[in-house]
Every structure is written in structure tokens, then in C-alpha cells.
């Protein structure tokens, strides 16, 4: 199969060559602080994660219409025409400059799939309105120099490339050729390290009755049913004694970072310790990060047989009540120390990972949308016009994300969105993964 082509475009010195070198299988481009070092379009075989492609680096463009500038524009235009996807790069340190605005208009007129890549984001970064004004519907923050943000870039690339050649190929067998990163998280002393030792049949990780033995995230490469898996044991998450509101203020930043990089998170619960708000906070954080999640109740062998049924009923009630946005999360009851039901956990992880990668064709989506919205109409507005959701498309996977077009998106209530999400989850068999909707106003005022 012919490799997909990704073209890097932007004004001088935004870091195109640095990203080119970062993604290239071999270093090709000269990198220097002097603007305009790259004057030809350069090609290399690129790779991000398991996805390989042809990468093009283009000259930095500015508004000066001299003869050199015209030739640089010709080089860039050819690279844009060749591209299946454009990464339009800007510099977070300098912010949006007039040249960025001119070049974004130049790029958008070719109607190619595009991602706005904000480079040099070594610290936390929030997109302000100036970035949205450039007109791109996908935006990510990275540091090409330090390699941060590349997982988000990978997700956006996979979502944006033509679905019949990239997305469908990956989803048909999402584990093959890929490394499934599974993070084992939870409160201290829930049995995370014991669980991993039982899986790999090796005392690889230090365990004991003391809470908090694991101080940092430990990665273990492993094979399960011909799948390459990276198991990541994390420090137990606990709140600082003075903090009561937000999981983001937990002291275990290493664990939080591991969750951000995970494909699937196993949330380990101690069956002998009541389900606490902290457990639900961790689960909510995983869902908000867009990761898939499997909940595992450990030490099940220590629960009295006469109490197990009531325990399960209460447990499911708490999960469904506090995490209604991800109905159908897999829940398994195990004994890590006795190796009871531990393989079922991995099977659940493989299954939910495939759901997390699920791609639905646009035709099937809109057939479902028409039926579902007609079954439950939105109310009439002033003037007798009804709010309608007329069309939708899937914009990415990991997690499944959808764009819906409406004549009046501001009037669509949260309860109606929940109705659509829950109906979609059932119709397309997508239990237990985050499903994200964004609404866009249709340009046709009569739709």
C-alpha cells in the first residue's frame, strides 16, 4: 500500500525542521535559530507510534514577495498538493503573528485535511481565541525539541487521514503491530504490584502489606495472546491532607502523567476497603483524559460468600451513579494473590481497546442519527422553528469523537446530548468508553 504523505507548513523558525527530524527515521534537516534555513522541500520516511508515512518539510513562508519568496511558495504549494494531511505549525513563544494568519488562509484554500500544531510548548498551554481564528478544527500543543505531545499528534494524524487507507486498516486489527499500554492505578495497597506479578508469573515488583511501596511508575514489556503489552505499575494515588476538591491536585504527578499516556487504565479497588470518593475521582480523571478503563476489585477471596451479592449490587450502583457518562465499564472481581480471574482482566482490556479505536462509517452514523432524532424531537423555538441535528461525522478515535451539525447548537441541552450518547452506545455496541460530541452550526440557515 502507498504510504500516506504528511506535509509540514509554517512561517520561518516555528520548528518544522525540528519536528521533521523528530519524526524522521533518519535525521535529514538542518536545524538552526536563523529563520529560513530550509529552502527546499525535503522528504523522509517518517514514523510515529506504529504508523509509517512519507514526511515533507517545506521552506518557511513569509509575506515578502521577492523572487526567492515566490520560489519558496512554489515549493510549498507543490508539497501541499502532494499531501494527504497538512500539519500547519506555529510558535507558542511568539504567539500568532500576521504571517501565520496569511499562511493559514493560503493553506486552507486547498481544502486538505489539516492540524494546527502549536510548537515550543514546554509548559502547560491553553489555546486562546487567536489560535481558533486561524480556522483549523484540530489543534494540539507539542514540543518538537523535547518530544512532548507526540501521542496527541499521533491520535490526530490517525483521525484526519483518509479513513479507507489509514483508520480502517488500523481498526481492523488494532492490536497487531502496536504496543498496548496498560496503566494499573488505584489507591495505595489495593494490590497493583501483586496483580502484575501474578500476570507475568514473576516477582518483578516489590510487594508487601505496607501501603505505598511503589514510589514511581515501573514499565514492563510483556506478551499476551500474541499481543505486545506494556504494563505500567504506578504509585498509589492519595490526596494531600489539605485538598478536598480536585484530583488534579494529587501529589502523585508521575502517576497522573502515566494515565495521560495510557491506552487503557486498570483501576484497582481493594474489596476490603469501602469504595471511596477518591476511587471515583480517579475513574473520572481517566474518563476525562479520554482513556478506556477497566475496573478491577481485588482481594475478592477475602469477602465472605454471604456478602458478595450485596457487595456487587452496591458497587454497580455506585459506579453507574457517579460515572453515568461511560455506562457499561467492565468490572471484574479477582484475587491477585491466588491468580483468580486475572486473565479475564487482560481479555477485557483487549476488548475495550478495540472499542476505543472503533470507527463508524458516515452513512451508518447518519442513518442512526435520523432515526434517533425523529424518535425524540427537540422542542420548538420562538418563531415555530425546531432545533434539529441534521448531520454528523466521526472526527477521530481513541476515544470515539463526533462532530454534529445543527441549525441552532446553542439550544441543544445536556440531557439531549446524554440521550444521543446513550442511544449510540447501545446501537453501536460501545460500552465503557468515553464518547465525545461537538456541535457545529450549519451554514445553511434553512437547514
Curated annotation (Swiss-Prot):
Pfam families: KH_dom-like, MMR_HSR1. GTP 2 binds at residues 186-193, 233-237, 298-301. Residues 358-443 form the KH-like domain. CDD domains: EngA1 (cd01894), EngA2 (cd01895). GTPase that plays an essential role in the late steps of ribosome biogenesis. Associates with the 50S ribosomal subunit. This is GTPase Der.
